[in-house]
Amino acid sequence: TFAGLVLLFVVCYASESEEKEFPKEMLSSIFAVDNDFKQEERDCAGYMRECKEKLCCSGYVRSSRWKWCVLPAPWRR
């Protein structure tokens, strides 16, 4: 029975780990930018755009959690 409990723990832990990554994956796919549909190339990243290599455009800040450019707000410090 101990082996069964260990197996149950491992399965539950793996499932929980996948659930933590799901929101990030879902949001990334929703806001993903397809390069074919870009009208112009910019030197900065706009609202809800990924900002790994580019800096955020004026008026936006980089979200520490999602690594996207978002509007500045008091709770995002």
UniProtKB/Swiss-Prot annotation:
Source superkingdom: Eukaryota
The keyword S-adenosyl-L-methionine appears for this protein: no
Secretion signal span: 1-14
Molecular function terms from GO: ion channel inhibitor activity; toxin activity
Disulfide-bond pairs as recorded: C44-C57, C56-C69
Chief place where the protein resides: secreted
Subcellular location: Secreted
GO CC terms in record: extracellular region
Membership in a protein family: Belongs to the neurotoxin 10 (Hwtx-1) family. 51 (Hntx-8) subfamily. Hntx-8 sub-subfamily.
Comment text on domains: The presence of a 'disulfide through disulfide knot' structurally defines this protein as a knottin.
The protein's role, per its UniProt record: Ion channel inhibitor.
UniProt name for this protein: U3-theraphotoxin-Hhn1k
Gene source species: Cyriopagopus hainanus
